[in-house]
Every structure is written in structure tokens, then in C-alpha cells.
């Protein structure tokens, strides 16, 4: 437990930031799973590409702002693009 006022404030700030960061990562997880689900269910190519674009946009934003490591963002984008290309070749 914090003993000083400033420590209490830091605890509150930390809790708020932690909650915000978790929400952002959760959004990303949902977007990535959405792309995977659309590919698995053989959805329309345009629908898959739209989901891909939104996921890549979110990855870029979170990587630049350091919510996730930039290399992780790059790796996930690469994995998504490989999945998308394989899906396009399959059709």
C-alpha cells in the first residue's frame, strides 16, 4: 500500500493506464481473430481485405505509440499478409 500522497496518485494513474492499454490490446486481438475467422470461413475477398486493412492500421498505430513492440507489429503484419496472399491464391 502506498504511504505517500504522490504514491497513491501514481497508483491511480497506473491503474488507469493499465486498463486503457489492456483495452487497446483487446481490440487488436479481436481484429486479428476476425481476419482469421473470415479466412477460415471462406468469406468474400473484399470483406477479408477490409478486415485486413483495419487490423494492419491498428497494428501500425499500436506499434508507433509503443503499446506493443514495433517488431511485434511488423511480424503480425507480415503473418497477416502471408495469410491473405495464400487465401487469394486459393480462390
Swiss-Prot record:
Q: Does the keyword Ribonucleoprotein apply?
A: yes
Out of the domains of life, which is the source? Bacteria
Kindly indicate whether the keyword Iron-sulfur belongs to this entry: no
Region described as Disordered: 1-25, 71-91
GO MF terms here are:
small ribosomal subunit rRNA binding; structural constituent of ribosome
- GO BP, one example? translation
The UniProt entry, under SUPFAM superfamilies, shows:
Ribosomal protein S20
Q: Which UniProt keywords apply?
A: Ribonucleoprotein, Ribosomal protein, RNA-binding, rRNA-binding
The record's annotation in Pfam families points to:
Ribosomal_S20p
UniProt lists compositionally biased (Basic and acidic residues) regions at 1-21
GO cellular component entries: cytosol; small ribosomal subunit
Described by its record, this protein's role is as follows:
Binds directly to 16S ribosomal RNA.
Q: Record's NCBIfam families?
A: S20 (TIGR00029)
The Swiss-Prot or TrEMBL record describes its family as follows: Belongs to the bacterial ribosomal protein bS20 family.
Q: What is this protein called?
A: Small ribosomal subunit protein bS20
Q: What is the scientific name of the source organism? A: Prosthecochloris aestuarii (strain DSM 271 / SK 413)
